[in-house]
Amino acid sequence: MTTSKDTTKVHKPWTEVVTEKRALRDARIDKHLKSDIKFPSDGISFETVDIDVLTSLLRDRKVSAVEVIHAHSRACEAQKQTNCLTEICFDDALEQATQLDEFQQEHGQLMGPLHGVPVTVKDQFNIRGLDSTLGYVAKAFSPAESDAPLVQTLKKLGAVIIAKTNLPQSIMWCETNNPLWGLTTHPEDPKLTPGGSSGGEAAMLLMGASIIGWGTDIGGSIRIPCHMNGLWGLKPSSGRLSYRGVEVTLEGQQHIPSAVGPMARSLSCLKLVTKLAIEAEPWAIDPQLPPVPWRDGIFQATSTRPLSVFRDLVTKLEAAGHEVIEWDSSLNSSIIDIMDGYYSADGGEDIRSAVSAGGEPFIPQIQAFVNRGEPISVFEYWQLNKRKIAIQEAYHDMWDNKRSPTSRPVDVLLVPTMPHTAVPHGSCRWTGYTKIFNLLDYTALTFPAGKAPRGENDGSFWEHVPRNEVDAWNQRLYDPVTMGGRHVGLQIVGRRFEEEKVPIVLKPKCIF
């Protein structure tokens, strides 16, 4: 981390900072939960409303933007149940909603395609006047001076940001816990994790307290919580959406760039906000982005071409006329090894210095993360980069050369997201299914594939001989009773900059 405020010394005991930050957040929530103002929309359920339905209600004046935002601020009772929020901006949200209603009254139309749509963003996204802490105590009470470009774009489109959501200490873990904001729990069972690192977003969406969430993904941080909560989540290729104004741990590393992406309860919402964000031409304000516009129609043929898939969906896919071929995963272990080398390249210095600046303890998983290895030399780093490029080329060539029995090329891959459903807090250990596509920088979308069957004990699972310690750990986690009925998500993976293509593959007529 390079800016002075990242290393600001906290002179108060860290516990006092935590108490003050949480009290400020809770007061801002309670102000609205205790409001005795009644609106017609109080009786409207927004849990299943998508953007098109909501904007139609707004356009027909069956509900106002103020009513919608008021209803969703009330819905943030989700915080009381799951501890999913960090920063609260209900007052600003209601002020913006009032302006939207006034615009509609004056002009007879909505301000934009996201007019009045309640949105939450992960704690990393800068919003003027609010902290972006990354779960670090030292970053508390250091408000951002301006909105991140993506936040600016969302507001111009009419969206209303209502809150920021929790993440793990440093963001570098697949659960959601930190000493500053505390532990976020799964909406359906407080003993379980909602995943991470965008776990606060997932909890808000599952509880219907937000319609669109925005997260980040450097190893599965969008896809894992979506898998555990029955949601849709897109990890674009890095450089498709702007990361400018989004705080991040390990700032300055370019070997595995983190990606910004949306999370939603429906595919239609996910595709719409991705399209709108790209059509806003983010490269005009972020020099790190290539000018790749949204390409409607370029991948329409995808829906009639073969899919490379596995396991449970094979029968459905074949019945729908798709060719099913087995994918070669032999490169995956090397990709994971390279990723792990990058994660520990600085010997944990970045995270260690950020935690020591605040004085708080490490959560156990991050303590283990920073102790994974010693810092490497510049020469060793170059060798790691050479390995990355070589494996990217090998994977590219393998994809190009793979053919179906009728000699058709592969469109996309169907891949697991995690080796288990939502599990007890502190149990997640392996993210290999997701992070391989961060190193490859491929587009990956997690979608709700169903729920684990209830009361079925698959004896063959216990006959499996674990390949290593982590495999044995995951096997011990398996419980057919507690995992029954839990959400299961799978990944559809395309190649670089195929954000338009991946959603098309998931149209109901194509797979389900």
From Swiss-Prot:
Keywords: Hydrolase. The active site is at 122 (charge relay system), 197 (charge relay system), 221 (acyl-ester intermediate). The keyword Hydrolase applies. It catalyses: a monocarboxylic acid amide + H2O = a monocarboxylate + NH4(+). Pfam families: Amidase. Pathway: Xenobiotic degradation. Its EC number is 3.5.1.4. Substrate binds at residues 197, 218-221. This is Amidase 2.
